[in-house]
Amino acid sequence: MGTPPVIAVVGPTGSGKSDLAVNLALELDGEVINADAMQFYRGMDIGTAKITPAERRGIPHHLLDILDVTQEASVSDFQDQARRLIGDIHSRGKRAILVGGSGLYVRAALDILEFPGTDPALRRRLEDDLAAHGTATLRARLQDVDPVSAERLSDDRRIIRALEVHELTGRPFSSFMPRREYFQPAVQVGLSVDRAALHERLAARVHAMVDSGLQAEVRRLDGLGLRTGKTACRALGYSQFLQVLDGSATVAEAAESTIVATRQFARRQLTWFRADPRITWIDWQDPDLVARAAGLCSQ
């Protein structure tokens, strides 16, 4: 037999991906690789709904708790680490199960995708340009060299990255976008959700996080440099509860804004994953969910 396909469990936040991944690992003798960028961070446990050791049920989980909150997550680094892990897991006769809602990270592990290099000095110059002239000026500059990216990108960091890539390579950033072509055989299982039910679940989950000590977790991480972390400080719940620590929001206000932001994030995740025709969708509340998913992964 050849190498088995990589399994990816995808879908919106709160849909039960982590639990399905564990059940598939138990069923298929697998190990789990985390593809949720915010779960890379040590100490970001409550707010990211990170799977606990007990919930892992003895299944090895990789790429959890690998970064300090001051470190920046890198899709390129993740691609290297995930592919090495996939090879190692397969070499031991086990199934590699990727799980997470960070769409680009999933694509980086599964698809043919190249990452242009970086230049810290160039990045700093572009950040200085942003501070001096504003987003509109940088977007206009990007429009001249890469109109596709200028139309698609709204986040300042990504606009800077697109300009950096163009200056480094002479190619538009959009030319590096991934093709829907697997790097090695893969099967993707998506959890299809009822949006109204998901919205209720996400609200309940945020309230449970608050009751479990999210504010204290954010306070502790703030002492470890959370605000200076370019990736970690943007995590859902953490940015909102930093405002509580600053006295600019109440706990109730931070919880409500976290619920709204989480629902918006779930919609963006669904839009991203629904665009991939290779994903097979199964209802998240299907009583035969594990058996159906295992069947797809065994074909």
Swiss-Prot record:
Q: Which reaction does it catalyse?
A: adenosine(37) in tRNA + dimethylallyl diphosphate = N(6)-dimethylallyladenosine(37) in tRNA + diphosphate
Q: Note the coiled coil stretches, chain numbering.
A: none
Q: Which GO terms describe its biological process?
A: tRNA modification
Q: Per its UniProt entry, what is the enzyme's top EC class, as one word?
A: transferase
Q: How does it assemble?
A: Monomer.
What this chain does, per the entry, is described as:
Catalyzes the transfer of a dimethylallyl group onto the adenine at position 37 in tRNAs that read codons beginning with uridine, leading to the formation of N6-(dimethylallyl)adenosine (i(6)A).
- Name under which the protein is recorded: tRNA dimethylallyltransferase
UniProt source species:
Pseudarthrobacter chlorophenolicus (strain ATCC 700700 / DSM 12829 / CIP 107037 / JCM 12360 / KCTC 9906 / NCIMB 13794 / A6) (Arthrobacter chlorophenolicus)
Encoding gene per record: miaA
